[in-house]
Amino acid sequence: MSYYNAYEPTLFIMVGLPGSGKSTFLKRRAHEFSTSRCGYTVVSRDAIRFSLLSDTDDYFAKENEVFKKFTQEIFDGLKVGKDVFADATHLNEKSRMKLLSGVLDCQKNNLDKHVCGYQVAVICMDTPLEECLSRNAKRKGRQLVPRQTIISMSNSLTFPEATDMKYAKVYYI
């Protein structure tokens, strides 16, 4: 495991299926994980998506804009020294690396050229598939994910190893 520095801001990448409890966990327990003197912020990809879409838009209609705003909000929090919780599925290493690359792009494009040092941790929501499906079935409107989509996503879900050197810490919930 990499060295964890309690004085450096942390990007916490949430990992888990829809319905695994990522957002609920953050509402209840994010404060327990944050060590930054500047506090923390939660950046929700779904909240960004729903703020950009009209009622008639396809779920993925503005995916590029959603991703850009998601990574920019993450970078903005890290830049001011906050711990940031990236609330989205991040099912596999490829999606986690895409997120980190997007945040790095924001740093490269930062107009004031402020160098933002931060570390990366992962919080894995290891919730059984049936529980995810049950929770999802209680959702309404756009928050309801098709059952088959979650089942398909479960086949792609990979958690990083606790010893993965890319991350300062890996938590399993």
Predicted regions and their residues:
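Active-site loop signature of alpha/beta-hydrolase-fold enzymes
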Residues: 48-50, 91, 130
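Residue-level preference for the first positions of well-ordered beta-strands
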Residues: 9-13, 41, 81-85
